């Protein structure tokens, strides 16, 4: 079978574009690249358009045109003045010819990083104090400058200790959890994380990564499997902590009442030199001492007060005797708590010790989730990202008046109601398929008893842990909190990514005509609308944050949060892809962070990571697991891969790799089991009916990614087997589905019936096919795909003239315009280009292109709050319009202009 690489004239033009890009670089960077061969210079920018005051360390991905970068080529990073920066790089993906397709690059942590950077060919510079990692039989030691972390390889301490200089500033760091056996008033059990496996993934010199895997154990039970990654960067006194866990309990009896990370902090300073700091907002801090010296009846002196407020040691001899002699009469405050039980409110309270009353200290709206306890001789800070967004969260400091304090970042606050993972509804007499289909008909929910199961859902949280040599100043603590809450991110410029010809078909922003400006405006407005709706509608909470709603209720002026299949979107019709393609072309921070939060949600919460549904995701619903339709189209690796390549994120890499064998889940989960009128097929063992788009296309994204990441031709061959066998069917892609042999990876049967679904191409199949056909030459598959693209949106008359078969139902004409545009571009058919442009601008079964900004603000008693509405919007329509706009601008820009002029006339 012939396989190979398709190199088009467009690819050649992109190589020229890359060559021209070097003129935009500093002379030093151009000279460095001149000494190389084909390595194009790569400008890198901060997504916020400005250098941050503090970077906690950076990892970003760089794409390379095919053939431009040989494996093993040394790469360096230079700042805006051409000075080489310490850096580390490694491969992420390869082209079929073995050249590198994506590399990841790490830069140290530090203040005032360069405003812009360039990746060039050349030996990387080592940092002044490289990350040093040493592994023994029972522990892993990481040293960064004066800070040393000792990490356990077994036992209950994720980190055994941390030293700043010669002083141990932190003892054990452990994962903790508690569970109640009833939603209210239940018996509580406590659990601690136990390490079962430790793996060193990187050893420096700029970045080291340790992966820890285990379970939470206690009360004779081991459950809540976890993966924790610890990241150390050169120049840093902190570790990045990425904490992932899977809920593997029984929703009817396991109500998690606390989930967190707890550090033990040695305390030996005088009580008045022990400091507590808790972030209260964007730049606010709650700053107190265990024994306060301010506000007393007697004045200790300005120097003492100033030193305590600044977090510095108080000179006891210089203190006024009227205070110095009565210090033991001033109460010490050992316990502090910030509880963020909603997205819009937190409260801070403190008490002298256990058994005494809590005293309210202050309250506010949105804490950034950083807590610190320590003294002028050292301490520990910890911060949780998405702290208020993923409420209920909490920061606890306990025993600050004793020899050992504890500092806890709660991902689920023990002050909140326990986590309730039960289904939101009961059976309601819907035991049989007939009743279930009636329910689907009225609420759009696919319900089946026992399939609305939360067991197997996961959540990943990101934290930062600092080992501080002294109490940081207020401004630096605020910068630490901000850098954790909204991490600065480097990204290659959109122009350079586009020129590398990666990630399928997409366009750069183009406002060169009134029509294109209207399209660009709507692309910006849509992202802004959804980003703002997250806050207006309160799409927050531990399990909800990152997702958006499916459909709007124009009568109640709310999204349909309580109506069956109209509530949480769960990746329906690819909002993840729309947002990531918007990021690629715009580089906008708002789009990036909206897409990032969605990726963290949809790849974890909406997907099963263990149990009978492992590898499948859940269709849109009131709860993220409530719909009984479990599908590969939701777990889809296509929704994760752009984030992975832009950031090198190891957790997302794990999630995509876990999907590689997920086709096997369909041997015991029949996803089409109750479709009305569906033909029940008796198939041989190991053969499952697959749709080409929503099933095979989703799995193909995982196999494509694994082939790129590993170079293992098994996955290329599996792709080729599927492609070739679809191409051999009588009607190819128009057959819609066919029996699939899991062992050979081939579709079997004749494919002699046409079965068109409007869903088949809108869960990443268009985007994955664009990449497959760029990489693998299977002519009969290409013909089958182009045939589908040509005929999906064809008129009934054209269809009848060609097939003499029933036309059938169609939907999503606007979104499918990009399929018409693709076949037009590939065949050079001007008539199809015009048809595609008319389909897109016609807006049928889609969002439509607005003339101006359609958003309307409302307030008053008919609305819950100040409300902004986009008439006719749904996430399905927004996602497909966004993708069609981005891709049609790349495929048929001239035809769009002609069709717009035709429409005006």
Predicted feature descriptions by range:
Residues 139-492, 545-553, 567-570, 628-631:
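Beta-strand/loop-rich accessory regions of lumenal/periplasmic or secreted enzymes
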Residues 78-101, 430-442:
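Solvent-exposed beta-strand/loop surfaces of large extracellular or lumenal domains
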Residues 534-570, 602-715, 730-758, 762, ...:
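Catalytic cores of eukaryotic secretory-pathway lumenal/extracellular enzymes that build
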Residues 127-154, 473-581, 585, 617-620:
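An acidic-aromatic substrate-binding cleft motif
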Residues 474-483, 705-717, 721-732, 736-755, ...:
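Terminal, non-catalytic domain-edge segments
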Residues 27-42:
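C-terminal segment of N-terminal export signals and the immediately downstream linker at the start
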């Amino acid at each position: 079978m012939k396989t190979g690489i398709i190199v088009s004239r467009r690819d050649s033009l992109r190589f020229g574009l890359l060559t021209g890009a070097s003129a935009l670089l500093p002379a030093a960077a151009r000279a460095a690249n001149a000494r190389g061969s084909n390595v194009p210079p790569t400008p890198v920018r901060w997504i916020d358009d400005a250098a941050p005051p503090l970077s906690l360390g950076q990892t970003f991905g760089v794409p390379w045109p095919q053939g431009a970068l040989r494996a093993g080529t040394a790469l360096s990073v230079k700042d805006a003045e051409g000075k080489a920066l310490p850096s580390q790089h490694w491969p992420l993906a390869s082209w079929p010819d073995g050249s590198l397709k994506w590399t990841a690059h790490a830069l140290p942590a530090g203040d005032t990083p360069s405003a812009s950077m360039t990746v060039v060919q050349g030996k990387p510079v080592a940092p002044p104090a490289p990350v040093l990692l040493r592994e023994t039989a029972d522990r892993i030691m990481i040293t960064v400058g004066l800070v040393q972390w000792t990490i356990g390889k077994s036992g209950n301490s994720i980190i055994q200790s941390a030293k700043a200089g010669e002083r141990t500033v932190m003892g054990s760091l452990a994962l903790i959890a508690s569970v109640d056996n009833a939603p209210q008033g239940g018996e509580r059990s406590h659990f601690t994380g136990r390490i079962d496996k430790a793996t060193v993934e990187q050893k420096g010199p700029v970045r080291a990564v340790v992966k820890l895997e285990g379970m939470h154990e206690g009360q004779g039970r081991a459950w809540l499997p976890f993966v924790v990654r610890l990241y150390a960067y050169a120049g840093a006194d902190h570790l990045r902590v990425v904490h992932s866990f899977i809920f593997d309990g029984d929703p009817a009896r396991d109500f998690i009442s606390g989930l967190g990370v707890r550090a033990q902090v040695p305390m030996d300073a005088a009580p008045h030199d022990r400091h507590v700091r808790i972030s209260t907002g964007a730049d606010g801090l709650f700053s107190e001492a265990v024994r306060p010296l301010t506000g007393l009846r007697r004045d200790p002196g300005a120097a003492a007060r100033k030193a305590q407020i600044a977090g510095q040691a108080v000179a006891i001899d210089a203190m006024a005797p009227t205070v110095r002699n009565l210090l033991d009469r001033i109460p010490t405050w050992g316990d502090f708590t910030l509880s963020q039980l909603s997205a819009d409110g937190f409260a801070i309270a403190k008490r002298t010790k256990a058994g005494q009353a809590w005293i309210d200290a202050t309250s506010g709206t949105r804490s950034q989730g950083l807590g610190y306890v320590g003294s002028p001789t050292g301490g520990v800070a910890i911060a949780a990202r998405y702290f208020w967004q993923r409420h209920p969260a909490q920061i606890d400091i306990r025993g600050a008046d004793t020899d050992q304090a504890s500092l806890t970042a709660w991902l689920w606050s023990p002050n909140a109601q326990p986590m309730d993972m039960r289904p939101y509804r009961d059976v309601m007499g819907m035991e049989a398929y007939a009743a279930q289909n009636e329910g689907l008909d009225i609420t759009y929910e696919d319900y089946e008893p026992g399939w609305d199961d939360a067991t197997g859902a996961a959540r990943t949280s990101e934290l930062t842990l600092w080992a501080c040599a002294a109490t940081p100043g207020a401004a630096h603590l605020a910068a630490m909190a901000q850098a954790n809450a909204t991490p600065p991110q480097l990204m290659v410029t959109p122009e350079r990514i586009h020129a590398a010809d990666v990630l399928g078909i997409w366009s750069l922003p183009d406002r060169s005509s009134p029509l294109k400006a209207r399209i660009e405006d709507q692309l910006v407005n849509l992202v802004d609308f959804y980003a703002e709706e997250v806050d207006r509608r309160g799409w927050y909470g531990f399990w909800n944050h990152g997702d958006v709603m499916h459909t709007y209720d124009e009568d109640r002026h709310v999204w349909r949060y309580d109506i069956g299949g109209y509530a949480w979107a769960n990746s329906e019709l690819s909002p993840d892809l729309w947002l990531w393609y918007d990021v690629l072309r715009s580089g906008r921070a708002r789009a990036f962070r909206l897409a990032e939060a969605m990726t963290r949600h949809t790849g974890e919460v909406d997907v099963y990571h263990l149990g009978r549904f492992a590898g499948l995701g859940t269709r849109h619903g009131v709860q993220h697991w409530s719909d009984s339709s479990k599908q590969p189209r939701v777990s889809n690796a296509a929704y994760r891969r752009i984030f992975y390549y832009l950031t090198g994120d190891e957790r997302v890499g794990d999630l995509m790799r876990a999907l590689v064998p997920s086709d096997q889940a369909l041997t015991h989960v029949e996803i089409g089991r109750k479709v009305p009128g569906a033909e029940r097929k008796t198939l041989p063992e190991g053969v499952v009916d697959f749709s080409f788009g929503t099933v095979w296309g989703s799995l193909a994204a995982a196999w494509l990614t694994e082939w790129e990441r590993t170079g293992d031709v098994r996955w290329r061959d599996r792709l080729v087997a599927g492609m070739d066998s679809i191409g051999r069917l009588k009607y190819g892609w128009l057959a819609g589905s066919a029996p699939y042999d899991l062992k050979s990876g081939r579709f079997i049967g004749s494919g002699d019936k046409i079965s068109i679904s409007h869903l088949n191409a809108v869960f990443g199949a268009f985007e994955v096919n664009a990449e497959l056909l760029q990489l693998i030459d299977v002519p009969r598959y290409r013909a089958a795909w182009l045939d589908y693209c040509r005929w999906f949106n064809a008129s009934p008359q054209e269809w009848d003239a060609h097939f003499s078969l029933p036309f059938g139902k169609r939907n999503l004409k606007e979104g499918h315009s990009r399929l018409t545009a693709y076949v037009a571009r590939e065949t050079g058919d001007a008539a199809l280009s015009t048809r595609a442009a008319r389909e897109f601008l016609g807006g049928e079964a889609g969002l439509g292109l607005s003339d101006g900004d359609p958003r309307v603000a409302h307030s008053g008693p008919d609305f819950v709050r100040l409300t902004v509405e986009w008439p006719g919007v749904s996430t399905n329509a927004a996602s497909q319009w966004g993708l069609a706009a981005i891709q049609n601008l790349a495929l048929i820009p001239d035809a769009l202009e002609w069709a717009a002029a035709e429409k005006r006339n």
